[in-house]
Amino acid sequence: MSYVIDRRLNGKNKSTVNRQRFLRRYRDHIKKAVEEAVSRRSITDMEHGEQISIPGRDIDEPVLHHGRGGKQTVVHPGNKEFTTGEHIARPQGGGGGKGPGKAGNSGEGMDEFSFQITQEEFLEFMFEDLELPNLVKRNLTGTDTFKTVRAGISNEGNPSRINIIRTLRSAHARRIALSGSSRAKLKEATVELERMKREEPDNFGDIQELEVEIDRLKARIRRVPYLDTFDLKYNLLVKQPNPSSKAVMFCLMDVSGSMTQATKDIAKRFFILLYLFLKRNYDKIDVVFIRHHTSAREVDEEEFFYSRETGGTIVSSALKLMQEIMAERYPSSDWNIYAAQASDGDNWNDDSPICREILTKQIMPFVQYYTYVEITPREHQALWYEYERIGEDYADTFAQQQLVSAGDIYPVFRELFQRRLVS
């Protein structure tokens, strides 16, 4: 039995280009299906793709054909039923099927076209047109990254980067240049030898001299090396500076006793979606997790999402801790600072004005964007209205939205992080 081993880099995805073209063509259908899937799934259930269905009528290719009206003169093969000049009734129009009623044995149609998109494609459509607002490049000394780019051909380089086509082309050109005169003389001598053998077969001396000359020319041509170090050509790769934007996202989650388990679950889902978005779209970004009730603590990812600690409610404790961490580790001159806060809006009454004061004086002047989501089906409380006053002063860098159920998470998330036009 014979085995064929496919060593091509893209062997198992030979139609990758066609698939990408298909995804671009039906982007609207796929995007709508992804949005429906996100609202249907749990936010944590993002480990697989999605089955997409496109109506058959939407994948039909446009074709040119004759219209159904008008008169036509057609010559048909001879038959026993009709003679010259007879008129044939026009067939009744209609679709392929027989319409309502009993099943028939004729007619045809097309089912919906279904296909599977991968997890990577699913996330690409899920986070399409989303970005961190106001992201700018900071002047960072010594923190530039580099990317390797093609920069033409070089005569020196690493053997692993040899350009075979350019090398063989150079070798061929060199051999032609060095042996060109010898090949021309060899051609002339060969023609002369054939003429003498044909017209002067008895002139052994001249014939022998020509044969010796031909052998000498062939030897000279063979001495030209097939490949020389001069011929070697390498793909030149250079490092190009790639200034990076350093960013940090502060995640502030209320875990006080007023937050029911359902409310906490919605908050966690919102932050899971945010964390997934950040890690997929940005290579260099720090995420600081802060949980708070009457006091605030910086925690790791595991504790942020799964700790069961609870208590009273003093929102300003989280804002004070965020300001301290900013001053200690993330100066605004070097970092793009973002924050996302989730709460049910329930706060100690005297603390809400303090939150507005801390945000207005110590946080908002130094951040690129601050988002607040309030998870409650009830009327807003004092904290929401204090934050509304902040939004009036910082319309471009502050946003607040309300979440009522888990189905609101994705639409609100897109609203908060929708890509904006730069004027």
Swiss-Prot record:
Where is the sequence biased in composition, kind Gly residues? Answer: 92-107
Record-given protein name = UPF0229 protein PSPPH_0628
Any Pfam family from its record, for instance, is DUF444
Please give the residue ranges the record annotates as the region Disordered.
65-110
Q: Matching PANTHER family, A to Z?
A: UPF0229 PROTEIN YEAH
* UniProt family annotation: Belongs to the UPF0229 family.
